[in-house]
């Protein structure tokens, strides 16, 4: 089962918590659509900032949005101008007071989502897929990952028949629930069609039962 299921969804409530944290009654559907619109807007607006995760919390009449990014300077802008414009736009979208928090990702090579997006960008620039995958694996292992697996699928190298290629180094225990396995996906839109990229990064085991462990760890790394 661990082979097939999304590793993050499998570990929710164990060592990972939800990216949208709020309670709603009848307006649940509209708030969910609002969350999706916010994430889509921020991903497109901050495409150059290396955004990995967007966490949305909704205390009473407010929205607290935490952006996990590899380049906080791009998000904040000169004298904080960009982040202020962003906050105003999000306040219009939500109709509530918005607080923006920026969490820096110190080691983007260990963030599965950023690794997947980086490989997808390389595939779009016609970099050889094997070279892109090997380079990502080596970088992650050098910076302290205990294991990494990368899958690329599609018309790789412009081949007539689509196939899936993968690389793995170290160990990636998909069944072990206490394992801190990060997972990310991206799509490369090439001239031959769309290639999918999946990345699993194993960072160690979290012994205590703490759903917020992932958030705390990323904040500790950001200090």
From Swiss-Prot:
- Per the UniProt entry, what species is this protein from, by scientific name? Rhodospirillum rubrum (strain ATCC 11170 / ATH 1.1.1 / DSM 467 / LMG 4362 / NCIMB 8255 / S1)
What taxonomic lineage is listed for the species of origin? Answer: Bacteria, Pseudomonadati, Pseudomonadota, Alphaproteobacteria, Rhodospirillales
Keyword entries, A-Z: Ribonucleoprotein, Ribosomal protein, RNA-binding, rRNA-binding
Q: Which GO terms describe its cellular component?
A: cytosolic small ribosomal subunit
Subunit structure, as described in the record: Part of the 30S ribosomal subunit. Forms a tight complex with proteins S10 and S14.
Q: GO BP, one example?
A: translation
Role this protein plays = Binds the lower part of the 30S subunit head. Binds mRNA in the 70S ribosome, positioning it for translation.
Q: What is this protein called?
A: Small ribosomal subunit protein uS3
- Superkingdom field: Bacteria
What family, per the record? Belongs to the universal ribosomal protein uS3 family.
SMART domains linked to this entry: KH
Q: Which SUPFAM superfamilies match?
A: Prokaryotic type KH domain (KH-domain type II), Ribosomal protein S3 C-terminal domain
Q: CDD domains given for it?
A: KH-II_30S_S3
Give the Pfam families listed for this entry.
Answer: KH_2, Ribosomal_S3_C
Instruction: Specify the KH type-2 domain's residue ranges.
Output: 38-106
Q: MF terms per GO, please? A: mRNA binding; rRNA binding; structural constituent of ribosome
Is the Ribosomal protein keyword given for this protein? yes
């Amino acid at each position: 089962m661990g082979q097939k299921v999304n590793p993050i969804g499998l570990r929710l409530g164990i060592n990972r918590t939800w990216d949208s944290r709020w309670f709603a009654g009848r307006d649940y559907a509209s708030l969910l659509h609002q969350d999706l619109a916010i994430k889509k807007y921020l991903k497109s607006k901050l495409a150059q900032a290396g955004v990995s995760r967007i966490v949305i919390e909704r205390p009473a009449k407010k929205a607290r949005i935490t952006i996990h990014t590899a380049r906080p300077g791009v998000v904040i802008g000169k004298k904080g101008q960009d982040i202020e414009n962003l906050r105003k736009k999000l306040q219009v979208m939500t109709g509530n007071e918005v607080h923006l928090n920026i969490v820096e990702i110190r080691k983007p090579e260990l963030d599965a989502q950023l690794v997947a997006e980086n490989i997808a960008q390389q595939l779009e620039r016609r970099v050889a897929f094997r070279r892109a995958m090997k380079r990502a694996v080596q970088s992650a292992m050098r910076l302290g990952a205990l294991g990494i697996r990368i899958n690329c699928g599609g018309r790789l190298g412009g081949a007539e028949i689509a196939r899936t290629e993968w690389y793995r180094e170290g160990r990636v225990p998909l069944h072990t629930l206490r394992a801190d396995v990060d997972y990310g996906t991206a799509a490369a839109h090439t001239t031959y069609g769309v290639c999918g990229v999946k990345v699993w990064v194993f960072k160690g085991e979290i012994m205590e039962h703490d759903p917020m462990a992932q958030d705390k760890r990323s904040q500790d790394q950001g200090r």
